[in-house]
Amino acid sequence: MDLSAEFKRWKAQCLSKADLSRKGSVDEDVLEIVQLLNGQEQFFTTSSCAGRIILLDRSVNGSEVQKQNCCWLLVTHKACVKDDVIVALQKAKGDAILKFEPLVLHVQCRQLQDAQILHSVAIDSGFRNSGITVGKRGKTMLAVRSTHGLEVPLSHQGKLMVTEEYINFLLKIANQKMEENKKRIERFYHCLQHALEKETVSTTSQPKEKVNTSYIRKKKRNPGKARGKRVNEEHDKELENNDHDDPGISDTIFPEDY
């Protein structure tokens, strides 16, 4: 079957499905990106989370929402305050863990070249742990993600193991990471707009073969460098200060059965 026609069928099926996420809708901070991608014929999003602060209890008892053998005691996509965490901790019966999870966005792409363009946008926006996978059925997926996270245990078997002062300290860090995550999302949106405009101009002004060759040659430049080196100079120092432990990402593409 023609891969282009198959991609259109996949996209129509995915976008027609009901949102089965816990929230039931796309997070506000990532909505513009999702709408922009789904409005392009070469992309569609399969899942997304704008970033969140969560408090989990590794106990399957209780009335709280359960996921992967955990109870969600607290979930917020905004800055979190100490009092909310203290109240939520009173429900913990197992090992309570405070986490900050940055943006995660999964995008199916029509072809590898489209995924490469989106991958460059992600890396240049600070999401240095992004990667491409190609499935056995020809599905090309891009995952936008970073290591700009946080995970700290607070209680064990229902007993609080840290002070309220330390919880307040952790929340300051988590809230700072949330703010940085939002800046990267905004940067991603603007970089995506620019990349799509540039690709449209290139496609209309040059034969398609030349556009493909030019882009691939650009991607192969300095293959030994870590992807972190490709962040724009104007915000490279900022990213290094905020996310200095991010690993470099190679161009390795590995098969995955989607």
UniProtKB/Swiss-Prot annotation:
GO MF annotation list: tRNA methyltransferase activity
Positions of post-translational Phosphoserine modification: S25
GO biological process, any: wybutosine biosynthetic process
Catalytic activity: 4-demethyl-7-[(3S)-3-amino-3-carboxypropyl]wyosine(37) in tRNA(Phe) + S-adenosyl-L-methionine = 7-[(3S)-3-amino-3-carboxypropyl]wyosine(37) in tRNA(Phe) + S-adenosyl-L-homocysteine + H(+)
Biased composition (Basic and acidic residues): 230-247
Region: Disordered, residue numbers: 199-258
Domain of life of the native organism: Eukaryota
Keyword tRNA processing in annotation: yes
Listed Basic residues bias regions: 216-229
One Pfam entry name: TYW3
Biochemical pathway: tRNA modification; wybutosine-tRNA(Phe) biosynthesis
Enzyme Commission code: 2.1.1.282
First-tier enzyme category under EC: transferase
GO terms under cellular component: cytoplasm
Alphabetical keyword list: Methyltransferase, Phosphoprotein, S-adenosyl-L-methionine, Transferase, tRNA processing
Listed PANTHER family: TRNA WYBUTOSINE-SYNTHESIZING PROTEIN 3 (PTHR48418:SF1)
Function field: Probable S-adenosyl-L-methionine-dependent methyltransferase that acts as a component of the wybutosine biosynthesis pathway. Wybutosine is a hyper modified guanosine with a tricyclic base found at the 3'-position adjacent to the anticodon of eukaryotic phenylalanine tRNA.
Family of this protein: Belongs to the TYW3 family.
Protein name: tRNA wybutosine-synthesizing protein 3 homolog
Lineage: Eukaryota, Metazoa, Chordata, Craniata, Vertebrata
